[in-house]
Amino acid sequence: MRIAVIGAMEEEVRILRDKLEQAETETVAGCEFTKGLLAGHEVILLKSGIGKVNAAMSTTILLEKYKPEKVINTGSAGGFHHSLNVGDVVISTEVRHHDVDVTAFNYEYGQVPGMPPGFKADEALVALAEKCMQTEENIQVVKGMIATGDSFMSDPNRVAAIRDKFENLYAVEMEAAAVAQVCHQYEVPFVIIRALSDIAGKESNVSFDQFLDQAALHSTNFIVKVLEELK
């Protein structure tokens, strides 16, 4: 099976890249694509760059050029739910934009005109990730909503404003909704799997720098388990 894995930063893709066999890397429009073999699958690893525009552009190139059957978006995120700690892993059930507001025209908050309010992760991929959850003993793995915006959520006031909009939000980051929206339009199944590098609004910038590598390791190890289970 041909599986695409997307991470925004070098720290988020480096560990998985090192695990690929027969790896070949090429750069298209400034985006790094590495093809290789892992767990019996052909894997295309994309380093997309940070933010929604980079994520949307590179995911479009990925789907047009490499035509993966499924897409997994990995990397770090800021924890939003009160039950979460740094290092925990969140599996998306749904992804939304948290910085889109066209409510003046009767759209839901976060809804892009012409698009659904949120983008549902593929049920089979979520179920597979849930199965892998049961093998994790040292970290907490949960599933829930992830929201995306082009800002790092370190300001407690901004965090509080987002909480008012989304009651059951588990994590925030800067690429997933763009990846999900492109996959939705191309009808390619996707899931987002993110490990927490910080807790949104609580000295997030300090925590991010300190725990990014740990988050990358946790998310990568979990994705390898998913690939091993994927048939």
From Swiss-Prot:
This is 5'-methylthioadenosine/S-adenosylhomocysteine nucleosidase. Pathway: Amino-acid biosynthesis; L-methionine biosynthesis via salvage pathway; S-methyl-5-thio-alpha-D-ribose 1-phosphate from S-methyl-5'-thioadenosine (hydrolase route): step 1/2. It catalyses: S-adenosyl-L-homocysteine + H2O = S-(5-deoxy-D-ribos-5-yl)-L-homocysteine + adenine; S-methyl-5'-thioadenosine + H2O = 5-(methylsulfanyl)-D-ribose + adenine; 5'-deoxyadenosine + H2O = 5-deoxy-D-ribose + adenine. Keywords: Amino-acid biosynthesis, Hydrolase, Methionine biosynthesis. NCBIfam families: MTA_SAH-Nsdase (TIGR01704), PRK05584.1 (NF004079). The active site is at 12 (proton acceptor), 198 (proton donor). One of its GO terms (biological process) is L-methionine salvage from S-adenosylmethionine. GO terms for molecular function: adenosylhomocysteine nucleosidase activity; methylthioadenosine nucleosidase activity. It is an enzyme of class 3 (hydrolase). CDD domains: MTAN. Its EC number is 3.2.2.9. It comes from Bacillus cereus (strain G9842). It comes from the Bacteria. GO terms for cellular component: cytosol. Pfam families: PNP_UDP_1.
